[in-house]
Structures are given as structure tokens and as C-alpha cells.
Amino acid sequence: MQSTSAQSSASHPERVFNFSAGPATMPESVLREVQDEMLCYPGAGASIMEISHRDKLFVDVLHDAESTIRELLNVSDDYSVMFMQGGATLQFSAIPANLLRGSGKRAQYVLTGSWGKKAVKEAKKEGDVDVLFDAAESNYDHIPSASDLACPDDAAYMYYCSNETIQGVQFPTEPNCPDSVPLVSDASSDFLCRPLPIEKYGLLYACAQKNAGPAGVSVVIMRKDLLDKADPNIPGYLHFKNHHDNDSEWNTPPTFAIYVLGKVARWLRDDMGGLEKMESINHEKSQQLYSVIDSSNGFYRGHAQTDCRSLMNVTFNLPSDELTAKFIAEAAEHKLAALKGHRSVGGIRASIYNAMPREGVNALASFMNNFASKNS
């Protein structure tokens, strides 16, 4: 596979730079490898989508995906790595079902954006929940300071979303959490964008379709001592121990999505050189766009406060709705696609996940400069 950060727009005459928040752009080299193997997976005599999930060929694919993720994140044997379906939405329910229901404890939630709000709504169906921090009054433009978080030592767990795609707010590091309390993270939109101290977490999960592969599979990394905490009467698919005990095959897993996820993980390891190098590239790409915003004399106004700007989702507004619509339309003419911001924030959202090539960021930065010059 190629060693560049992703595709060139010249690779196909109709291919654009895709800034979608998810499902999102993927490495072209991975897409081409999948294309080459689509009709007949090596040694199978059939497509990877056609063989049984119990077939040794697919079991090897699953194990390879798991081992590559473990290698990238330095995940120890104290943790289970599971592949599940249902996206982050399922995890909003599964986590409190496993760690809160019947515990006699209270879960602590940190709300820095829309996905945290959705998670706490589901958690309240399973037990007692406290909101430790909520940035709603500022439309979720910042993260808490250390003094804002006073998590009790006896909490069931503390939950946060490491990167809020809609608001473009990201924790630069883990929030303070007592050692006695499992730290739980929705890492869906910044999974594998940088190294992580996995040992600080009780549970970390990510749906793949933003930064790690296609829609249909979620990765759950869970400390094994927490697997037995759940009420045995919770619905079977929600019970993490069922997935751990059955090697992510408690039911038929999303075979194709796991297969592609494994290829993306190997691309990160073999082509990009691992997560430290990927993090450096992500800092460079995001800073290029933030520099345009900061030097625009107020024409572009970033949503997130500067100390928590996202590496993955660059959000900003223009002086008027009319200019925003014009920006989106003209950008599309330059093959810069899917830039419309979420309705709750408005403006522009440029999602520049791992697979967004430097060429795409260069093209967007150049367009932003030219657009501001012509419309200021």
C-alpha cells in the first residue's frame, strides 16, 4: 500500500476531498486493496462477505484486526478487545446496563457536546446519574478545568466523550478521575488519531465509521475485571461478557466491517508509521486550518475555545448564513465536499480524520483564504 496519508483527488475523475463527519473518508490504498479482494478473498474461493464467520479464514481476519489494534494502542492482556454492532448508540445503553444497573452507585457524566447529552439520557434509564460538568450554556465550546470535576471516589464510573464531532471540541488529555473509579470514554471520532494511555481507562469504545473503517462495527476495549460487574439479567447482546467469552462471535459479527477495520489498522501501523507519527500529522493538518481562521481578521470564527480545538473536526462560522451557503456551494465546485456544519452549531465543519490527505487540507486552506479575500 502507498505511504502517503491517503488518496489523491486525481486518483479518479469523480473523486472529491470528502470532509464528512462520518461515514468518512478512508485511505485510498485500503479501498483499492478491498476492491482487489472483493470478488475472491485469497484462499477462500469466495468474497470475504460470503464466507462463514466461523471459517478459519475469517477468524484469522478478526484476530489480526484485534492484534493490530492492541499493538497500535499498546493494549495489555488485562483488557478485552471486542467487536460489536449498534454503534455508539448501543454503547450509550450497554455501558450503564453493565456498570450501573443494580450497583447501588451513581454514574458521573461530563457533558461537552451533543454525544455526551445522548449518552446521559440513556444512562438515566438504568440508574442514578450525576452530571459533573455541562457546557450547554456556551453551546459546548469548551472542556472542564480540573477544578470543575469533583468525581466521588465511590462512583460507578465517570463517562466523557473525548472528541465531540458536532462542536469540534476535544480533550487534549484524559480528565482527572479517581483511581477507584473506572474512566469510560466515547472515543468514536478520535480513535487511533494519537497514542492513548489505555491503562487509565476502565472502558473505551469507538464506532469505526469516523476514523477507523466503515459503518457497522464498534471496538470496545474493556478492563477484564469489570466484565463480571453486570447484572446477569440484562439483555444478552448488551452483556459485554458474552462478547468477550465468545471471541466477538456471540452472534454473527459484522464480518466485512471488521475486515476493513483491520486493513485500516495495518495502514496506520505499516504505512503511516504508528500513532505517534499519525498524531504529528494530525496536528499539522488541523493547525493549517486553524491558522487560516485565526488570521482572517474575524471573517472566520472558530466555535471551540483554542485550548480544546479538535484535531479531527474543525468547526467555524462565517459572517452570515448567505456567505455560509455560498462557501459550501463554491467549495463543492472545487471538489471540497460535505462541509456543512451541524444545524445546532451552523457554519462549516471540516472533518480531517487520519485518512484525509494533506492535499485535501491544502486545497481547503487555499480555498478559505481566497474566499475570505473575495468576500470580506
UniProtKB/Swiss-Prot annotation:
Location of the protein in the cell: Cytoplasm
One CC-aspect GO term: cytoplasm
GO biological process: L-serine biosynthetic process; pyridoxine biosynthetic process
Residues that coordinate or bind L-glutamate: R54
InterPro entries referenced in this protein's UniProt entry, alphabetically: Aminotrans_V_dom, Aminotrans_V_PyrdxlP_BS, Pser_aminoTfrase, PyrdxlP-dep_Trfase, PyrdxlP-dep_Trfase_major, PyrdxlP-dep_Trfase_small
Annotated coiled-coil segments of the chain: none
Signal sequence, renumbered to the chain: none
GO molecular function: O-phospho-L-serine:2-oxoglutarate aminotransferase activity; pyridoxal phosphate binding
Pathway: Amino-acid biosynthesis; L-serine biosynthesis; L-serine from 3-phospho-D-glycerate: step 2/3; Cofactor biosynthesis; pyridoxine 5'-phosphate biosynthesis; pyridoxine 5'-phosphate from D-erythrose 4-phosphate: step 3/5
UniProt cofactor note: Binds 1 pyridoxal phosphate per subunit.
Name by which UniProt lists this protein: Phosphoserine aminotransferase
Record's keyword terms, sorted: Amino-acid biosynthesis, Aminotransferase, Cytoplasm, Pyridoxal phosphate, Pyridoxine biosynthesis, Serine biosynthesis, Transferase
Family: Belongs to the class-V pyridoxal-phosphate-dependent aminotransferase family. SerC subfamily.
Cofactors that this protein relies on: pyridoxal 5'-phosphate
Keyword Nucleotide-binding belongs to the record: no
Any Pfam family matching the protein: Aminotran_5
